[in-house]
Swiss-Prot record:
Disulfide bonds: none annotated. This is Quinolinate synthase. Pfam families: NadA. [4Fe-4S] cluster binds at residues 113, 200, 297.
């Protein structure tokens, strides 16, 4: 069973949309970035949810496109001394936690995540302290400070196994921050879980009613859903999983049409894997002016070519990630606990969001 905390009604201030670049401007920035990557001994590492041109640039320059944990692990083993992380801030922190000796740059440190914003370390710590008999399990989409308070850090592809393990030991669990993913895991495992009430602004907008109507238009299509979506949406899915798992499902499922309920940035990599299939954006609760994220993270959209070039060119406090060493060491403990658990299960850990 699970115990639901009171919903935290937070309206997140979205950043302004980036100003579109002309084609000649794009080509000039791409050329500059390629040169700067060489000069700075840097590699570009991008998340699946960044814009397609950023993912393409990462791949064409020998960098990497993946989920948050894959990004951090790639940066850890890649020989470059500077990592430029195109994603949101907790991803840069994760890279610094795993690879403290390298310089970690981001196009902007203002690229937030609603899951991170909705789980402030002081309030979360206060809640955890009020339930000292609970094991604290947090999603990777959290700050270094929240990770440091946790007993376990998990990604969406291994969360079920870890919660099942803890439940088998009779341990009640505090789960944070995503309420939808937490409810999905609680339903699957039957574990005793207290759920922090955060949400991803992108996945929270997907609508079951609208999805049913779309399915009626495409009756032969498979529905792929990220578990950060509401339960009513997850119930309609043919496949539920993390970003990496959804890409794999698109390839393994026999259907030639896929309705995809996650950030539309995933379409770049997914279409690479299944060029012969038709990918369809799942509908959000609103359309046009009435949707907020409109199936694309507004903070991911801040990782533009101009910002990447500026980060490489200038560096400095407005671009570089720093994590207090004591906090880094403490947050590494629950992260390593997950990695060790995955290794024991002989699982390849792939992550979140």
């Amino acid at each position: 069973m699970s115990h639901i905390l009171d919903t935290i009604n937070t309206v997140y201030p979205f950043p302004p949309k980036p100003i579109p670049l002309r084609d000649e401007e794009k080509q000039a920035y791409i050329a500059e970035i390629k040169q700067l990557l060489i000069e700075k001994d840097a590699v570009l590492i991008a998340h699946y949810y960044t814009d397609p041109e950023i993912q393409a640039l990462a791949e064409s320059t020998g960098g990497f496109v993946g989920d948050s944990l894959e990004m951090a692990k790639f940066g850890n083993r890649y020989p470059a001394t500077t990592l430029i992380i195109a994603g949101v801030r907790f991803m840069g922190e994760s890279a610094k936690i795993l690879t403290p000796e390298k310089r970690i740059l981001m196009p902007t440190l203002e690229a937030e995540c609603s899951l991170d914003l909705g789980c402030p370390a002081d309030k979360f710590t206060e809640f955890c302290d009020a339930h000292p008999d609970h094991t604290v399990v947090v999603y990777a989409n959290t700050s270094a400070a929240v990770k440091a308070r946790a007993d376990w850090v998990v990604t969406s592809s291994i969360a079920l196994e870890i919660v099942e393990h803890l439940d088998s030991e009779g341990k009640p669990i505090i789960w944070g921050p995503d309420r939808h993913l937490g409810a999905y895991i609680a339903k699957k495992t039957g574990a005793d879980m207290l759920l922090w009430q955060g949400e991803c602004v992108v996945h929270d907008e997907f609508s079951a009613d609208a999805l049913r109507k779309m399915k009626a238009l495409y009756p032969d299509a498979a529905i792929l859903v990220h578990p950060e979506s509401p339960a009513s949406v997850v119930e309609l899915a043919d496949a539920v999983g993390s970003t990496s798992q959804l890409i794999k499902a698109a390839k393994t499922l026999p259907q030639q049409k896929m309705i995809v309920a996650t950030d539309k940035g995933i379409f770049f990599k997914m279409q690479q894997m299944v060029p012969e299939k038709e990918l369809i954006e799942a509908p959000t609760a609103g359309a046009g002016a009435t949707c907020r994220s409109c199936a694309h993270c507004p903070w991911m959209a801040m990782n533009g070519l101009q910002a990447i070039a500026q980060a490489l060119r200038e560096g400095g406090k407005q671009h570089e990630i720093f994590v207090d060493e004591a906090l880094r060491v403490k947050s590494l403990i629950p992260l390593n606990r997950m990695l060790d658990f995955a290794e024991q299960l002989n699982l390849k850990v792939k992550g979140n969001a």
